[in-house]
Swiss-Prot record:
Residues 319-339 are annotated as: Disordered. One of its GO terms (biological process) is sensory perception of chemical stimulus. It is a multi-pass membrane protein. Keywords: Membrane, Transmembrane, Transmembrane helix. Its main location: membrane. The gene is srg-7. PANTHER family: SERPENTINE RECEPTOR CLASS GAMMA-7, SERPENTINE RECEPTOR CLASS GAMMA-RELATED. It is found in: Membrane. This is Serpentine receptor class gamma-7. Belongs to the nematode receptor-like protein srg family. It comes from Caenorhabditis elegans. Pfam families: Srg. InterPro entries: 7TM_GPCR_serpentine_rcpt_Srg (IPR000609), Nematode_SR-like (IPR051119). GO terms for molecular function: transmembrane signaling receptor activity.
Length: 339
């Protein structure tokens, strides 16, 4: 049986650690990226504490459970970036010692490489789950919390399983240490030759973009008139951010999937792809906080005397006939679902 081709043009990479690159310049890339990764890491931890420790009863609905899962996966992704992937790529002074460890103990790569890619793909599915839960809140305005709460384990299970369909080949495939810019990182050689991580992720992204577009249009179509202006603005802004972030990921995956074997494949894309994925990792919790006033006040320990709590909003919720025209559909609490 013919072996599958490597996913990289290996001639682009060195065979051992290089001392040709400036330690200061390469280290600076790492420290600059730490400027947004480390604050985001602390923010994500605090969001989890807020939703699961400080106010677990108020944030027990589906969107906040999806947010919690997304935060946990983002924390794993950032920790792997800070202490493994970007650290060993941008610190040439660590290359000689730690590349030997990775080569001699391949179990390290076998564990972290699939987890790292799983965490990247996870956000594609979690955003679909988030927009779907919001759509249910509009289509089923009365008692949607209770109905969705019964299915939270099912929703979370599906969201967690979907990325496995994209990254499973990285689990069973051989990993290899390659050298780049004085540092090193890990690649994989596909055991199942036709199953490409980049092409599967690209397909997953396009499906997610289509799903988010359709769901956002349906969401705006069924919003009641009382909350239409502010809620539509939030839906549009949130959807645009997610779609633009996914578009950049799709552009990178497309370029990588079809041109990585060429000699002219730009070397800077290895660095730039980190920024592309950081847009979603760093940006989404900020977007969420920006549009969820109640939640933002809880996260930043602000007084909420002038606002209504989530429990108050739920108690004021009124049913309406979703077959009625949009302008005749009364409901007082819809901007709470667009958190």
């Amino acid at each position: 049986m013919a072996s599958s081709p490597p996913i990289y043009n290996l001639e682009q990479y060195g065979t051992n650690c290089s001392e040709e690159y400036s330690n200061f310049y390469e280290n600076s890339k790492y420290w600059i990226q730490c400027l947004w990764l480390i604050p985001t890491l602390f923010l994500l931890v605090w969001i989890i504490i807020t939703t699961r420790v400080r106010y677990p009863s108020q944030y027990s609905n589906l969107p906040y459970w999806i947010l919690t899962a997304d935060c946990v996966v983002s924390i794993i992704l950032i920790l792997l970036d800070l202490f493994v992937v970007r650290l060993f790529l941008y610190f040439p002074q660590l290359c000689s010692k730690f590349s030997t460890i990775f080569i001699n103990y391949p179990i390290i790569s076998d564990i972290y490489f699939p987890i790292y890619n799983y965490a990247r793909v996870f956000k594609t599915g979690s955003q679909c789950g988030m927009i779907l839960s919001r759509l249910f809140c509009v289509l089923i305005p009365f008692g949607h919390d209770e109905k969705l709460r019964r299915h939270i384990p099912l929703f979370l299970t599906i969201i967690c399983i979907l990325p496995i369909l994209v990254v499973w080949n990285t689990v069973i495939s051989e990993k290899e240490v390659v050298f780049w810019y004085g540092g090193f990182f890990v690649i994989y050689h596909r055991r199942v030759g036709w199953v490409s991580l980049s092409k599967l992720h690209l397909t997953f992204i396009f499906v997610s973009i289509s799903f988010i577009l359709i769901s956002s249009l349906l969401l705006m179509r069924h919003l009641p008139i009382e909350s239409a202006v502010n809620a539509e603005r939030r839906v549009i802004t949130n959807s645009i951010f997610i779609i633009v972030a996914f578009f950049f990921q799709a552009a990178f995956q497309s370029f990588y999937a079809f041109f990585r074997y060429t000699d002219w494949y730009p070397r800077f894309l290895v660095d730039f792809q980190f920024i592309i994925y950081d847009v979603m990792t760093v940006g989404y919790p900020l977007i969420f906080l920006n549009f969820a006033k109640e939640f933002r006040n809880h996260v930043f320990l602000k007084s909420n005397r002038k606002g209504r709590t989530l429990m108050e909003l739920r108690s004021m919720s009124k049913p309406f006939n979703n077959t009625m025209p949009r302008q005749e559909s009364p409901s007082p609490n819809y901007d709470s679902i667009l958190a």
